[in-house]
Amino acid sequence: MNTESMYTALGITPAVHRFGEEVLAGLRTRFDEIDRVAEYNQCKVIGAMQKNRVDATHFAATTGYGYNDAGRDNLERVYADCFHTEAALVRPQITCGTHALTVALSANLLPGDTLLSPVGAPYDTLEEVIGIRPSACSLKEYGVHYRQVDLLPDYGFDYPAIEQALRGGVKLVTIQRSKGYATRPTFSVAQIGELIAFCKRIDPNVICMVDNCYGEFVETIEPSDLGADMIVGSLIKNPGGGLAPIGGYICGRQDLVDRCAYRLSAPGLGQEVGANLGLMPAFYQGFFLAPTVTASALKGAVFAANVYERLGFRCIPNAAEPRHDIIQCVELGSPERMVAFCKGIQAAAPVDSYVDPIPWAMPGYDSEVIMAAGAFVQGSSIELSADGPIRPPYAVYFQGGLTWYHAKLGILMSLQKLVDAGLVTLEEK
């Protein structure tokens, strides 16, 4: 059996394939570590499912109001138990991660309240939600104030400035775990726990919310294990396991989640309404698969960092650093390299492989964005995908891979496109 010939048939030259195999030879220890975390988290998910006696009746579809939806309600108990929280809201009516965060913020902030980000600027799409960039129905328009404390030059937390902001009166602290389209490191759960503990020492009543997108099941603990009052994420990222076609979750304190449910539906209705529309099998099975799917994506990210760092590109995290989310940032230095990289990811896809991604003015962003994603679920970033804003330092953000072998093919194809365009040579730097 000649695997190299299969790669050749898909458009990978022997030189690029051999380069990848040389990189891969040094990653066995890293991959074993990723597998150990996945094994732990797999047991955690199975334990939560068994505790809540998941059975075939929980897969039944509901329509209309969705009253007495046993599958939906039990899934929320599974999430709450797995993430060690009092309550959970897990719904297909939450359309994306930004929507989930908007629900959580608007449900728990009233006119005159103050929102604090102690980790610098939020993800691009949240700028309009908060009102940093003007938008109708933003938190600012409803009278919610916003404060921001930037990170120190070494990306540490500016504790004196955070303390000063908190003593000025803050209702809710929002902590973005992942880097988004920034080039800072992703925070570990331990770092987030330290920040939460600090905030609670200053003001025990402050609500600490963590944007957990891209981070679920990367470590053996979650921010909710270290004091987060709410954790928020998307089901078309890690916890959906590549099977959930839509959805988001909010896990946390019962009173806070109750308010989120009222905001998502209506006061007085809360979690009692919201039909599952036949999505329960995908939601349950996706959550079951999530630890191993996340492990595949992590292997792809580690492989990408080692490939591109060897070629002289700055990678965040670098090739040796521990992982706290599934995103790999590679600073490519030019728009042409970004486009070629993304064309490679697209060409390696099982869906829309014939399409050429091009930069476009994507809603919610202040610069053109290029996105490559030959995905079964539109916008799914647990599936192999790459994207980034067309602005210096021309960094592309690679994530996902339902299987490790698809992630590997995508990275090799991205390199192949760069080599073919004369933008990269296979010489170690």
Model-predicted regions and their roles:
Residues 76:
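Generic structural marker for isolated residues within well-ordered, non-membrane alpha-helices
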Residues 309-428:
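Conserved C-terminal alpha-helix-loop-beta "cap" of PLP-dependent enzymes
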Residues 3-24, 28, 35, 45-51, ...:
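Conserved PLP-enzyme active-site core in the AAT-like
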Residues 58, 62-63, 89-92, 326-331:
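Short glycine-rich or small-residue beta-strand-to-loop segments that form or flank ligand, phosphate
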